[in-house]
Structure formats: structure tokens, C-alpha cells
């Protein structure tokens, strides 16, 4: 097994453990045992549990971005749906991983950088698909940023409470996206029509 193959194997095993156990209950010894390697070898690839988790979460973020391509040739709601479904599916299958990143390690700068980088990439793709320019693009950019944070919070609430189902999460998120973009367009139209507001 090449070093890259070994590393990928360790990531896969770690991902399985973090997906089903709280962060504090995942031990590096368990990862090494499942992989059939010594702890010393595991630590050569990942100096600690934090580094292992960060590598797993970064890999997941990259995969989700690959599944979240936005085609400007189709309506935005349709273009976004596939990426939203991919994220919801990942959250459902990796509940403990997502809660670890957003709750247990919410103050970890490495994890937060991974989350912020993904959100920034998603916003840029969606914004480009809107084909806007100037001030209207700036308003839509802020609206999309707010929407992406909303989706994150909505999914975390769903994972933690289970007070609503996946279909409701999806429906609310898509409806909120359309409302946010419509509001951004309305604000732009109002600003253009109101000379006093333009001066302000």
C-alpha cells in the first residue's frame, strides 16, 4: 500500500468513527486498530485527533463542492437543488461529524476556515449564476451569504432536535433562497427609484 493509499484508508476509517460517535469518544487507538497499523504509524500521518478530524472535514467539504456545481443555463432554484440535496444527505449520514465541526470545535480556527472557505466558494458560484453587476450584485452577495448561514443553522437545528424532517428542511431552504434574492432585487429597485435613498 502506497503512503497515499494508507492515508486515504485512515481518513475513511476516521470518517466512519467520527460520523457515529461524539468527538470525545473517538480515540486514535481505535483508528489504528481498525486500520491494522501501529499508533506510531498513525501519528506519522496525523499528529493528533484534531489534525485527523480537520483532514476528514476538509476532504468532505471538497467533495461537497464538487457536487454543488451551479449551471447558469438553468434556473437558480434547480441549479442549487442538487448541491443542497448533497449537503443535506451528508449531514444526515454524518450527524456527529457535522455537530463536532459546528459545536464541539466551533472555536477551532482550522475547522472554521474550512467552513468559511466552502461557504465563500458556494456564494461565488451562486452569485456568478445570478448574472448581476454593480450594486445589485453586492446586495445579492450579502443575501446569499445570509442564506448560506441560514441553511447551516437550519440543518444543525434539524440534526440536534429532529423536530422536523428532511423534506421540510429542503423546502424551507429553497423557499428562503428565492425570497432572499427577490428581496435583494426589490431593495435595488427601490433604491434606484428613490432619489433621497440614493443620496443617503
Where are the language model's segments positioned?
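N-terminal intrinsically disordered/low-complexity leader segments
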Residues: 1-5, 187-200
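Alpha-helical structural segments
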Residues: 5, 9-16, 20, 34, ...
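Short amphipathic helical patch at the helix-1/turn junction of helix-turn-helix
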Residues: 22-23, 150
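Flexible coil/turn residues that form the inter-helical turn or adjacent wing/linker of helix-turn-helix
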Residues: 24-25, 45, 162
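Append "Primarily bacterial transcriptional regulators
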Residues: 26, 30-34, 42
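Amphipathic alpha-helical segments used for helix-helix packing
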Residues: 90-112, 116, 125-127, 153-160, ...
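Amphipathic alpha-helical packing segments from all-alpha helical-bundle domains
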Residues: 109-134, 141-149, 153, 168-182
Amino acid at each position: 500500500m502506497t503512503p497515499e493509499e494508507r492515508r486515504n484508508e485512515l481518513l475513511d476509517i476516521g470518517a466512519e468513527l467520527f460520523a457515529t460517535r461524539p468527538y470525545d469518544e473517538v480515540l486514535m487507538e481505535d483508528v489504528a486498530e481498525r486500520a491494522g497499523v501501529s499508533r506510531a504509524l498513525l501519528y506519522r500521518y496525523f499528529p493528533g485527533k484534531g489534525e485527523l478530524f480537520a483532514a476528514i472535514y476538509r476532504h468532505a467539504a471538497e467533495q461537497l463542492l464538487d457536487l454543488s456545481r451551479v449551471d447558469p443555463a438553468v434556473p437558480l432554484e434547480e441549479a442549487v437543488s442538487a448541491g443542497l440535496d448533497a449537503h443535506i444527505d451528508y449531514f444526515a449520514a454524518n450527524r456527529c461529524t457535522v455537530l463536532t465541526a459546528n459545536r464541539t470545535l466551533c472555536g477551532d480556527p482550522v475547522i472554521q476556515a474550512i467552513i468559511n472557505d466552502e461557504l465563500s466558494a458556494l456564494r461565488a458560484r451562486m452569485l456568478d449564476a445570478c448574472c448581476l453587476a454593480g450594486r445589485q450584485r453586492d446586495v445579492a452577495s450579502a443575501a446569499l451569504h445570509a442564506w448560506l448561514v441560514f441553511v447551516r443553522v437550519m440543518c444543525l437545528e434539524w440534526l440536534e432536535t429532529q423536530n422536523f424532517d428532511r423534506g421540510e428542511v429542503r423546502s424551507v431552504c429553497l423557499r428562503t433562497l428565492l425570497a432572499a434574492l427577490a428581496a435583494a432585487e426589490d431593495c435595488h429597485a427601490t433604491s434606484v427609484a428613490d432619489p433621497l435613498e440614493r443620496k443617503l
